[in-house]
A protein has these predicted regions:
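Intrinsic-disorder-associated interaction segments
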Residues: 1-8, 12, 73-80, 87, ...
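Short linear interaction motifs
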Residues: 12-14, 85-103, 233
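Short helix-terminating capping/connector loops at secondary-structure junctions
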Residues: 25-26, 102-107
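Acidic, proline/glycine-rich low-complexity IDRs
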Residues: 116-235
Length: 235
């Protein structure tokens, strides 16, 4: 069983805060996937991160991808992606802390979920450098398993990916789980946003006619900590 040290728990609390900060609307559920590899995979990647959240509402809402948020809420994409990068650095820091606990084998990817004030983590030890599925294909499979996006909701190519996955031999990889409560209070969004041009019943941002002057993008607020980290990364 993994040793969740005080430092690891502090990193998780920091990750939780960042996730709450980065979502500029009320939501019910959140699922995050991230991988961290010691060596580049077949595509030359050493890891990735994405998350989806389910907006709060009376009617069933579609999952929103983190990379859709800037367009959906008229945010500066470059600034927002800096927040995503900082979040990924926290995941890498988390993995380094687990390495310090004398683990002979370290996880390659994790799935975090937040729902009903519970914070759950699934640690997956699959060897991503020796898998038949590409990063994109694993993303499709992950959405199927965790978001419930079925074959009827995806493209023809994605259906083929799911067919291969479901009909192929399953490799049983080591997995471990962690479950704890969320006790963070007085959480504020890091994003100062306006909903003036946002319709909660519409999946798209309201289109502004060309003849009307477009308003400035909503401001993303960085804390002093974030500013210092970005300065450090530029060195």
């Amino acid at each position: 069983m993994l040793n969740h040290t005080k430092k690891i728990k502090e990193i998780y609390e920091d990750i939780q805060r960042r996730l709450y900060y980065m979502i500029p609307e009320k939501w019910d559920k959140l699922y995050l996937y991230s991988s961290v590899l010691d060596e580049p995979d077949k595509e030359g990647k050493t890891g990735e991160l994405f998350f989806y959240y389910i907006p709060k509402g009376i009617f069933k809402k579609k999952p929103v991808n983190v990379y859709e948020i800037p367009l959906k809420f008229n945010l500066d994409e470059i600034q927002y992606l800096k927040l995503v990068e900082i979040l990924y650095q926290k995941i890498k820091e988390l993995r380094k802390e687990f390495k310090k606990s004398d683990e002979k084998e370290i996880w390659t990817n994790i799935t975090l979920s937040i729902q009903n004030l519970r914070f759950k983590v699934e640690y997956d030890y699959t060897d991503l450098n020796n898998t038949e599925f590409s990063s994109y294909e694993r993303h499709v499979i992950w959405r199927y398993e965790y978001l419930g996006i079925s074959e009827t909701q995806v493209s023809k190519d994605e259906k083929e990916i799911l067919r291969r996955y479901m009909s192929g031999a399953k490799t049983i990889a080591r997995k471990e789980h962690y479950d704890t409560g969320i006790y963070i209070q007085d959480i504020e969004n890091m994003v100062a946003y306006s909903t003036e041009n946002y319709d909660d019943n519409n999946e798209e941002v309201e289109e502004i006619p060309d003849k009307i002057e477009k308003k400035h993008k909503n401001q993303i607020l960085f804390s002093q900590e974030e500013m210092e980290k970005m300065k450090f990364n530029k060195k």
